[in-house]
Amino acid sequence: MRILKTDIEGVLIIEPQLFEDERGYFFEAFSERKFAELTGIKTRFVQDNESRSAVGVVRGLHFQLPPFAQSKLVRVVRGAILDVAVDIRRGSPTFGRYVAVELSEHNHRQLFIPRGFAHGFSVLEGDAIVEYKCDNYYAPEAEGAIRWDDPALAIDWHTIHNEAIVSAKDKLNPLFEECERLFDYNTDYYA
């Protein structure tokens, strides 16, 4: 397992070690011990989620507020996505900035998104199957969301805006500047 830093502290790309031969391949998708040793992050994932989405689908931007905030570890089993994490920690030097990483069945990369970030993705290839681990349970009362096409964030989703397939619920998400309840950069959400 190899850990790559991104432009935003805490958002990490994980590249597993792949073993290939004439039979196919094998890799360890996650090891809690190795992850903690390589990153210094001690988190315990308690829920696994899976979604299937067609090319052109955009999901997000979603987050859960404290005390139900979630870290996520996202990977693609089939297809390809552009995975996006937006820093929504007030006071952060990267507040309002985002990281976008292509995750695919070919590159086997994973994206670790810490608490304090909004998450979304667009489907670039195939009928994408996305799996993600969460370190806190889903809590509908703590749901938060931001419009995927917020001009202030200016996220390049690698999709044509008027052809994006977005849920009715996500179309109603507020703009970033309208979100009153976000995170505080100086608060430890893992304590």
Which sequence ranges carry the predicted segments?
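Conserved metal-binding segment of the jelly-roll/cupin
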Residues: 103-127
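Non-catalytic, conserved peripheral segments adjacent to functional cores
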Residues: 1-106, 127, 134-191
